[in-house]
Amino acid sequence: MGELTHFNKQGRARMVDVTEKAVTHRRAVAAGEIRVSPETMVHIKNGTLKKGDVLAVAQVAGIQAAKHNWELIPMCHPLPLTGIDITFALSDSPCMVEIQAAVTCTGVTGVEMEALTAVSVAALTIYDMCKAVQKDMRIENIRLLSKSGGKSGDYQIKE
């Protein structure tokens, strides 16, 4: 188990100094799901919700979330992201939208939080777009699938 790096000697929160870290290519992929009713899935597929195209809006929201992650998560650094790709897969059994975000940069710290934030905000946006027809949607299973680059090495989830 690694040590916690976001605390100073007094045990108080700090932003880690990354000045001396090597610049490397970083990539992280995160995923999550939002479970919806069959009726809501029909609306998503047919584009019949009053707020507009659910997946198009969620895609832009996820991209924006990754870009602004450092403003939301206190100890995250602002990063020069070089790529953000949000994809969706629709499933009818069970009814859900699967969300995946891949984020890349060349920098001194990883992009895991950016990928996780992108998935989270995309799911929240789907909820917002669909809440007029369903209130009991469930956002589930948000997780890091993989990361590469950096001192701690590569990671791949074991599913």
PLM segments and residue spans:
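C-terminal binding/interaction regions
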Residues: 1-55, 60-77, 82-159
